[in-house]
UniProtKB/Swiss-Prot annotation:
Gene expressing this chain: tmem35a
Membrane topology value: Multi-pass membrane protein
Chain ranges on the Cytoplasmic side, renumbered to this chain: 1-5, 83-88, 132-160
Name of the protein described by the UniProt record: Novel acetylcholine receptor chaperone
A single MF term (Gene Ontology): acetylcholine receptor regulator activity
Family statement drawn from the similarity comment of this UniProt entry: Belongs to the DoxX family.
Organism: Danio rerio (Zebrafish)
Known function: Molecular chaperone which mediates the proper assembly and functional expression of the nicotinic acetylcholine receptors (nAChRs) throughout the brain. Essential for the proper folding, assembly, function and surface trafficking of alpha-7 (CHRNA7), alpha-4-beta-2, alpha-3-beta-2 and alpha-3-beta-4 receptors.
Signal peptide: none
Amino acid sequence: MASPRTVTIVALSFALGLFFVFMGTIKLTPRLSKDAYSEMKRAYKSYAKALPALKKMGVSSVLLRKIIGTLEVGCGIVLTLVPGRPKDVANFILLLVMLAVLFFHQLVGDPLKRYAHALVFGILLTCRLLIARQAEDRPEREERREEQINAQEKNKVKVS
């Protein structure tokens, strides 16, 4: 039977992956929801206006939206389907994207209800990453503990 930690990581990875594939697709195409796509276009225009440095670098609102949408779709697919270390990398990239999105929302002065999802999913990504890292560190700690116990037993003096 799988450990609770493994079940948690798999469930979080799958759910987060599907969410980011969905949200990234909404940013890239109006096929899923024309209203949501239009709202994304409007929001990213306001983000680009609030950051004139992006315009100086040649990053338009369309390019910014497509970059973030593509990152979300790509990393979402990795979180959903790819096993191993790439999930942690995708998780970290998505965490950075969520931080950028939170920054954009704060920059334009959006109310909390507009960016609460980014906050929640940022927390979930952080939890998933911490749980995954904790699971990897545990066998090493147990081995070190066993070595310390063995060393202590060898150093004990038998009293007769």
